[in-house]
Amino acid sequence: MTKDLYIALHIAAKEGQEEVAGILIEHNAEMSAATKKGFTPLHLAAKYGNMKVAKLLIAKDAPVDAEGKNGVTPLHVAVHYDNQNVAMLLLDKNASPHACAKNGYTPLHISAKKNQLDIAKTLLDYGAKVDAESKAGFSPLHLAGQEGHMEIASLLIKQGAAVNAKAKNGLTPIHLCAQENKVEVAELLVDNGADCDAETKAGYTPLHVASHFGQMAMVRFLLEHGVRVDVQNELGYSPLHQVGGHIDFQYCGINIVLALLNIVLNIGETFVMKLNTQYLNVG
């Protein structure tokens, strides 16, 4: 046994040594033995895409849903490393597509985040829940939106994913598009009924978020779709207040201010006067 608690069968699984693995199993090697990370030999076969060893381990009744220390199963690992054949094998052998890691991520969350379209299709074919929630309340569509993965987002929506799903803090997929400037996915979401004025629990709209992070393309997109520019969060901040928080103001902040003011000036003096009062109230 190594310092990381690898036994010989772990190493055979990692290296794809089917014959060696078979001999070790015949001599009663422990197929449920866990490394420091809680990985069984099947986890390692899944990680390194060693199909023959994975088949052998499963044929010898290795636990297909064994959990590592962070709750990941061999299926989570196969999906994370884009080893589709091993993922298919595990699903065929009744590995759960609903298994949740400690952060609540299912294999479908991982495929959505990593843009693994074929594996996502396979997981859905095996009954993966399209709106499964992580511990923070994020769905696979949240993650696809955040990463800008258009094809995955489209697949999830076609399978019935909720475009206005709210995480525990109230963030929707379009909020995450706004944060990361993923306009293409935002367009897809809006075309399928996403609310451009959705508010988080703290009252932040996608426009607040896009303005805060200096995402000019998303600001333009949201303004073109008629979002409210006068909305205030629970602290009384408008999208205009958010500009410059964490961005290079000279690079894009001025353009965002001008775009917002252009709209603000068309909705009357009341809001502008309120902004002026808030900016002057420094004492």
PLM regions with names:
Residues 22-29, 56-62, 88-95, 121-128, ...:
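Ankyrin repeat domain, specifically the short helix-to-loop turn at the C-terminus of the second helix
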Residues 250-251, 278-279:
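Low-complexity, intrinsically disordered or signal/transmembrane-proximal segments
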